Amino acid sequence: MSTFRVNKNVNYTVMSNHHLQDKRLSLKAKGLLSYMLSLPDDWDYSLKGLTVGCKDGLDSVRTAVLELEEHGYVRRQKVRNTKGQIIDYDYQVYESPVE
């Protein structure tokens, strides 16, 4: 069996293989995490924003994010206004799961 490698000069992402080999994750979750890791550090993460770069809808992206949260690859912290209402989420994305 032969292996084909692409010459990586520009526009590629270096990331850990950990999540790609994690048997607990669905292919959808692995793909979404890979996509999230390819985004710039200052990207404004949101469920709606993540749907812009893929074919999946909001519900599909939401279930993948919840799966990644369950396994420690994503943490979302609620951001509240002065009235205590949730106005946003801060995302922390990890290449390897955290407890």
Spans of model-derived segments:
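Short, Lys/Arg-enriched N-terminal segment that forms or immediately precedes the first helix
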Residues: 9-23
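Charged low-complexity intrinsically disordered patches
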Residues: 93-99
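Winged helix-turn-helix DNA-binding recognition segment
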Residues: 19-31, 36-91
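N-terminal leader segment of winged-helix/HTH proteins
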Residues: 1-10
